């Protein structure tokens, strides 16, 4: 009986792969149904013997309590965008400085939701959303209902793969037809439909909506030599892999593919919003490395944004956390890139003057990066008024005088007690890239502020359940959930806190670099400007901003309150002892390593106290060169920099 159940699971998973992924079924529908019914019958008789990879999980429904956070073992990076051929040429030139003979694999950029799938011994054990790249949401049960995701692999591999989950156009039309018949609001576009479906708490809904996937990356260490090889491996393992791709040896060939796909785009059975261009050889990818947000070996070309005409009705002026006052146009509604747009950014007061935007103008609207609606220009032939837009002289939040500094394009409110700035600052503090307090978004911040429950970030940690129950629409469950999220954030590594404080010019990357150097926020607060300027990639602008921030009495009070509330102020990443072998040394890796992966080599260097840089300069102390080292090695030799090999590093 147990053997028969195992045999049926294996057969049905194989047949499902042939049907959904290869579109080449080897058995008829009736044969499949007969085997499926036999398995269902056996599982009903022997529920304790049901295998986790059973295909019956795909259609069975369960109601989930919610989605837990999922720590990605391997970070998911975003991609640098390109909107013109010139930007692709610049990317190509950067790559060819290091690898003159580089080739590129061009793949379709599917307009869906990024997912990560983890397998242990060939069995799917976890599936998650991208989230902030480090922490996503565990949506394993929902992903098990996506029919072309294999529950088991043909080999007992432990592997993590990445891809895109999307809703085909036909499925999107069917879902919206059903929603229309049921009197429900229709989804704006397939991407929103896919994202909404994967966040359903009722898994049976996911099973009915016919989502699909394309996998494109092996995130765990791989023995493959090229991106082409990776895609072939994924296909052999049973994953859906998009066959519409091309290997290009020149940027001209890349552009030819972009133009060809652009012409065929509307005929595809799924939505795409661009082409992803990747350096094909994985050794070259490792050598080129990453910025804090994106790989240097890939770029995403985005197709030109759709443009529509709309009439300007009015302008709202809103205050951001740094005091910048931004104008937003209220427009007659238009359909743009699958969504209804009635508001669009006007950027700043200088932009309004430059484009000569006036009251009641007809304007061209587009989505910058296919995401943010923005006003592009005026249709002057349809102008009905010569009246200029009213530009405020007072802050719309606190009524303080607005300033327009000579070196800035924006109006700015400099009142530190401005309610809008405080609320925006609180929302930033709780945001995903900062303290990542789930549930503490702008709407909840506004409610807390209105009831005078929170006035600064330390006040967040003074909140209790009773405070949260005062908020509109908050019940015991939602109050407990937010309270627990606040408490959990106390243990974040301090670079998240530093970024969350919203110090001008100090982004997430600078926060990490600073805490790697000074180890905790109190030590950073005592640092001299010269110490900060001496750090590679940081400059005087950041040093002055930090010095000014920490010199304020209010900052010292705030840090003390945070510490007393139990918020961690220390960096929890790798810290090198002051007497470590490479303490304070700037080291560059180049060439192909034989025994260590580049990630392992970098981690070891960090443990030894080194700062690992991506390029060779006069500030470089040491270059570790593997096989086929290129221009970095040549430059190191030219500058007289110490050069060692992988064997030397392994002995340390």
Curated annotation (Swiss-Prot):
The active site is at residue 109. One of its GO terms (molecular function) is DNA ligase (NAD+) activity. Zn(2+) binds at residues 395, 398, 413, 418. Pfam families: BRCT, DNA_ligase_aden, DNA_ligase_OB, DNA_ligase_ZBD, HHH_2, HHH_5. It catalyses: NAD(+) + (deoxyribonucleotide)n-3'-hydroxyl + 5'-phospho-(deoxyribonucleotide)m = (deoxyribonucleotide)n+m + AMP + beta-nicotinamide D-nucleotide. Keywords: DNA damage, DNA repair, DNA replication, Ligase, Magnesium, Manganese, Metal-binding, NAD, Zinc. NCBIfam families: dnlj (TIGR00575), PRK07956.1 (NF005932). DNA ligase that catalyzes the formation of phosphodiester linkages between 5'-phosphoryl and 3'-hydroxyl groups in double-stranded DNA using NAD as a coenzyme and as the energy source for the reaction. It is essential for DNA replication and repair of damaged DNA. This is DNA ligase. It comes from Streptococcus gordonii (strain Challis / ATCC 35105 / BCRC 15272 / CH1 / DL1 / V288). The gene is ligA.
């Amino acid at each position: 009986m147990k053997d028969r159940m195992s045999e049926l699971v294996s057969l049905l998973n194989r047949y499902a792969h042939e049907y959904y992924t290869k579109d080449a079924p080897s058995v008829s529908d009736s044969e499949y149904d007969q085997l499926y019914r036999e398995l269902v019958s056996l599982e009903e008789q022997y529920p304790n013997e049901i295998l986790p990879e059973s295909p019956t999980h795909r259609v069975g429904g369960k109601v989930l309590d919610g989605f837990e956070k999922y720590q990605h073992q391997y970070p998911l990076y975003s991609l640098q965008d390109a909107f013109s051929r010139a930007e692709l040429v610049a990317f190509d030139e950067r790559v060819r400085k290091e690898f003159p003979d580089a080739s590129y694999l061009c793949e379709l950029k599917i307009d869906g939701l990024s997912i990560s799938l983890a397998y242990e011994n060939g069995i799917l054990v976890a599936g998650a959303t991208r989230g902030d790249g480090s922490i996503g949401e565990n949506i394993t049960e929902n992903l098990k209902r996506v029919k072309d995701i294999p529950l088991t692999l043909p080999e007992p591999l432990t592997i993590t793969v990445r891809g895109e989950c999307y809703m085909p156009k036909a499925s999107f039309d069917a879902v919206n037809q059903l929603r229309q018949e049921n009197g429900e609001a229709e989804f704006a576009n397939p991407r929103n439909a896919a994202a909404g479906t994967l966040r359903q708490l009722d898994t049976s809904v996911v099973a009915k909506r016919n989502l699909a996937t394309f996998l494109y990356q092996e995130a765990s260490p791989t023995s493959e030599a090229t991106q082409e090889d990776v895609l072939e491996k994924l296909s052999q393992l049973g994953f859906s892999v998009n066959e519409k791709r091309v290997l290009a040896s020149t940027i001209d060939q890349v552009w030819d593919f972009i133009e060809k796909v652009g012409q065929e785009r509307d005929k595809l059975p799924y939505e795409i919003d661009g082409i992803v261009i990747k350096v094909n050889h994985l050794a070259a990818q490792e050598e080129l490395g990453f910025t804090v947000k994106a790989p240097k070996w890939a770029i995403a070309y985005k197709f030109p944004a759709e443009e529509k005409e709309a009439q300007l009705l009015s302008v709202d002026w809103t205050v951001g956390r740094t005091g910048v006052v931004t104008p937003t146009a209220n427009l007659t509604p238009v359909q743009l890139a699958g969504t209804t747009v009635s508001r669009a950014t006007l950027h700043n007061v200088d932009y309004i003057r430059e484009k000569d935007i006036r009251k009641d103008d007809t304007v061209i609207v587009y989505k910058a990066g296919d995401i943010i609606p923005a006003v592009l220009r005026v249709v002057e032939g349809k102008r009905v008024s010569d009246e200029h837009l009213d530009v405020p002289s007072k802050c719309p939040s606190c009524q303080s005088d607005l300033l327009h500094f000579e070196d800035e394009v924006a109006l700015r409110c400099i009142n530190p007690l401005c309610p809008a700035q405080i609320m925006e600052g609180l929302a930033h503090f709780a945001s995903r890239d900062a303290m990542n307090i789930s549930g503490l978004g702008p709407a909840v911040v506004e409610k807390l502020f209105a009831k005078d429950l929170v006035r600064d970030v330390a006040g967040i940690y003074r909140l209790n359940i009773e405070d949260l129950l005062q908020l509109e629409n908050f019940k015991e469950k939602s109050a407990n959930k937010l309270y627990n999220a606040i408490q959990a954030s106390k243990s974040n590594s301090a670079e998240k806190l530093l970024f969350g404080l919203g110090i001008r010019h100090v982004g997430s990357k600078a926060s990490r670099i600073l805490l790697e150097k000074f180890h905790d926020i109190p030590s950073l607060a005592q640092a001299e400007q010269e110490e900060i300027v001496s750090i590679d990639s940081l400059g005087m602008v950041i040093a002055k901003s930090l010095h000014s921030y920490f010199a304020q009495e209010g900052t010292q009070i705030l840090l003390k309150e945070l510490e007393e509330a139990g918020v961690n102020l220390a960096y929890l990443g790798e810290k090198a002892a002051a007497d470590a072998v490479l303490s304070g040394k700037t080291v560059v890796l180049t060439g192909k390593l034989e025994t260590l992966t580049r990630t392992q080599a970098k981690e070891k260097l960090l443990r030894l106290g080194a700062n690992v840089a991506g390029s060779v300069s006069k500030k470089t102390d040491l270059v570790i060169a593997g096989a086929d080292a290129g221009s970095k090695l040549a430059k190191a030799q030219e500058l007289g920099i110490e050069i060692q090999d992988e064997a030397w590093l392994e002995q340390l």
